[in-house]
Amino acid sequence: MFGDLWWLLILSLLVLSLVTRQGALILLTVLLALGAVLSWLSYRFGLYGVQYTRSLRDRRIFCDQETELAIEVTNAKPLPLAWLLVRDRFPRGLGLVVQDRIHGEDLETFPPELRELIVLRGHESARRTYRVRGYHRGVYTFGTATMASGALFGLQQKRETLEHLDYLTVYPKIVPVESLELSFERPAGTGRAQRRITEDPLRQAGVREYVPGDSVRHIHWKNTAHLGTLQTKLFDPQASEVVMLALDVQTTYDPYQAVPEYLELLISATASLAVDMLEQRQSTGLLVNSGPGDTEHWTHIAPSRHPEQGARLLEALAPLTGFRTLALSHLLYRSMHVLPYGSTVVVLTARTVEPVLLALLTLQRAGHPVVLLTVGDRQPWIPERFTTHHLGGRDAWHQLEGLALA
């Protein structure tokens, strides 16, 4: 409607200028007509030949690490672009570093988005770069983006939505294993001692008296016959054992509630142990009673020492939520048929309920050494037959948050 009135006004001025034969009025009419033509061309062909790309320097980063986000706009036609407004959705939970100040939750728009107003000549490109920091684990989605352009004075606009998405994975917080203070309670009240999680059954280090929970396969029958009491073999730690990390994402007895600090402590401890074990050349796998996006019943990554195993484990841990799809006890029972014989099972949980303890006892009787790592503001009571360590609760997580990466 406005366009018709505009052309009618120009036509009226043209007729008036010809009748009055005033040079200034004729010049004004020509300039207005030329501006109207350019404005119409800008509106009609503004987004034609305009290409928008978004790229991340890294697709996976560690917690507190930075990467670079770049957007590039190319005007592939000879007609200049008077103005182009780009709006690109920026994921909540990431930090946008501008002049060493981190933005993110305080971006002006909701939902947060990047905005750029760009002017381009024909066959010209413009590039903008941003520093992005991942300060919390997760899988973050960039997009969708919207481009708007139009008439010279913005009276008419055309918009185009770009559905292409990009994803950035932020790994869980990884801390030195020493900061977890893994001093384990030895079975049968033998006291606290620093020890590795796994033992090599091929390297015997000594003999001690048998206690309930010890594997029958490790009984030293010759010493048992000599002393008249059951004796168990002790083994040297060795980085060739198979370890399966079993993570319980349910942090309260109500499956529909959660304690975020417990969950982050459990996931950070799992990630830190996995990285440390792989560095020691231990074959390491993962079990979780949840899946990515809560779409799978449970997560299972077979033990491996492959160079890419660490990335597989960290990527599986990054998107986890506190919503479990399977009780931990059921997870342990279901996974028994996929556990390599004699592999050590390290269970990390905030709930040491009776079904879990019974499942651990079943694993022990099946020949799997079991290590239980617990989380909570109060240390739970655990039967002496289990090797256990309490990682702490909310305060422990807040302390780990401030530690440097391992």
How would you label these PLM feature ranges?
Residues 1-45, 93, 315-406:
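Von Willebrand factor type A / integrin I
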Residues 295-326:
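Short, charged loop segments at secondary-structure junctions
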Residues 267, 271-274, 310, 314, ...:
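A general structural signal for well-ordered alpha-helical packing
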Residues 197, 303-311, 389-397:
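Short, structured secondary-structure boundary patches
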Residues 25-26, 34-299, 344-348, 362:
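An amphipathic, basic-hydrophobic helix/alpha-beta surface used to engage anionic
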Residues 235-237, 276-278, 304-308, 335-339:
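Short, conserved, surface-exposed binding loops centered on an aromatic residue
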